[in-house]
Regions:
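Membrane-proximal envelope and lipid/glycan-remodeling enzymes
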Residues: 1-508
Length: 508
């Protein structure tokens, strides 16, 4: 009897896993093409520019020094021991952006209809598309995780759509910040550790997870906050037998952390000497922790311009699902609860907690995605007490749909026009002392949206509709070339959505 049972169940599980992987591939492709179409394709902040400059230096000069940033009066970083300018952030994101930069430099910039003077615009556009890929990868990993812990495919797809459309992962897919990459790393590690069944975590999985988390500090040093949280989640999940896996995770993560510290020591003279400048506008010190905790918490939770609930409405339902997630997968529930809390209290004290010029709670974006993992159990509708009544399950889905629509509207407003056009005028986003104004809200971007909807006059380059095809056309790229690129993206989106629908029906 046991033998026949095993031989029957195993092929079914294998077929289910294979079907889920197919759906994930189509889901990734659909969001990839969707994010490509909706991308701004522009870099505008010092953070984005200096990542682009580092990538450019790596491709063209084999160096991470950014002399071009100094020449263009757009340098944000420090001079190293040899008096060479270095960007503020480690080179992790820049290294991973190399394929997109090279694609723009050696292919897109040489297309017919692209003037030689516009090569820099086209290369920046191509580099920015890396965020679309990282965001799409986040959504695909998110879906695979939920299926892996037993959530039905349809509910997992719905939850993935809520994250991909209703949270800042959508908005940040259009800019060159590091948050989409960090989110993809965290969800990918969660999938590796907790999304592949209830068996104890193997040492190989723990070692790979630790290595990836350690190397993630080369993308952003604060990603180190995730290492102890994931290790603790492993212990909570499997108890004392998981001590070895937790230790291996921490030990292998040390490889990436040591690489970061060695990078700092070689360039700046000390392991804890990072590339951040000591001060920015008006000599204001940015990288300290002098924000009152209450102010930072208010900003992230309740302020109109940075609240996680304003910019990620699905979190409201996710919070209600944490208990269900705990019943399904304790390690995931621990991680989904603790990492957002760690990020919240850490960045609430950070001087520049608002994230500089940006949309919404930038620093919270990767942890927001992890908290949204609790959406899956809520949408599955198979846990007490809600499963006892279909009306309750239907009500939850209606609430989820409403939150998805609200979140998508917020992201669309955020992406429609350049946030810099709204935030740069003095007194709107920052006060005279370069302190973030807690009264700031999306009302300015909503006003810009209506302004450009009502106006038939084309805006200057960098203003108006913040879409790649708009600003590239203003820059001189021919309409025919842009139409061909856009049609390829539209065709890819259509094929991907059709494939996703077909495979989704089969799975259901």
């Amino acid at each position: 009897m046991p033998t026949s049972s095993i031989s029957f169940v195993s092929p079914a599980n294998h077929a289910r896993a294979h079907s889920s992987r197919r759906i994930a591939w189509w889901l990734f492709a659909a969001f990839q093409f969707f994010y490509l179409l909706t991308s701004t394709g522009r870099v505008r902040t010092p953070d984005e520019y200096n990542t682009l400059y580092t990538t450019e230096s790596l491709v063209l000069r084999g160096s991470t020094a950014v002399p071009q940033a100094v020449e263009l009066h757009n340098f944000y970083g420090r001079y190293d021991l040899h008096n060479r300018p270095r960007a503020a952030y480690p080179p992790g994101q820049a290294l991973l952006c190399i394929p997109w930069y090279a694609f723009g430099q050696y292919l897109l910039a040489r297309l017919p209809g692209v003037p030689a003077d516009d090569a820099d615009l086209v290369v920046a556009f191509s580099s920015c598309l890396s965020s679309a890929t990282f965001s799409a990868l986040t959504v695909a990993f998110f879906f695979l995780f939920l299926v892996g812990i037993g959530i039905p495919a349809r509910a997992s797809l719905f939850a993935a759509a809520m994250v991909g459309l209703g949270t800042p992962i959508f908005a940040y897919s259009g800019w060159l910040f590091s948050e989409p990459l960090s989110a993809a790393i965290f969800v990918g590690v969660a999938l590796l550790l907790f999304g592949r069944g209830h068996a104890p975590i193997a040492w190989r999985s723990a070692s790979i997870a630790g290595l990836v988390l350690g190397l993630a500090t080369l993308v952003r040093p604060t990603n180190a906050l995730a290492i102890p949280v994931f290790a603790l989640a492993v212990l909570v999940r499997d108890g004392k037998p998981a001590l070895r896996a937790a230790f291996i995770l921490c030990a292998t993560s040390a490889i990436g952390v040591l690489a970061l510290l060695a990078h700092n020591a070689l360039l700046f003279g000390g392991p804890f000497e990072f590339g951040y400048p000591t001060a920015a506008e008006s000599a204001k010190r940015l990288n300290t922790f002098d924000t009152p905790l209450v102010k930072g918490l208010y900003g992230f939770l309740l302020s109109p311009g940075k609240s996680i609930f304003v910019f990620a409405p699905p979190l409201i339902l996710a919070l209600a699902g944490l208990r269900r997630l705990w019943k399904l997968e304790r390690g995931a529930a621990t991680m989904a609860t603790l990492l957002p809390l760690v990020y919240l209290f850490f960045f609430a004290r950070y001087t520049q907690w608002e994230g500089g010029y940006c949309v919404g709670p930038r620093y919270m974006v990767p942890s927001i995605v992890l908290l949204c993992l609790a959406l899956g159990p809520m949408l599955a509708g198979n846990a007490a007490p809600f499963s006892a009544a279909r009306t309750n399950a239907a009500r939850i889905k209606k609430i989820a749909l409403l939150l998805l629509v609200l979140g998508a509207l917020v992201q669309c407003v955020s992406l429609a026009t350049s946030f810099m056009e709204d935030q740069v005028p003095r007194g709107r986003y920052y006060d005279a002392n370069w302190t973030y104004r807690l009264s700031y809200s999306l009302s300015g971007q909503i006003h810009l949206l209506w302004k450009y909807l009502a106006s038939g006059e084309p805006a200057r380059l960098g203003l108006g509709w913040d879409r790649w095809f708009v600003f590239l056309h203003k820059g001189g790229v021919s309409a025919a070339t842009l139409a061909v690129v856009g049609l390829i993206m539209l065709a890819g989106l259509g094929i991907s959505v059709a494939g996703l629908a077909r495979n989704g029906r089969c799975a259901s």
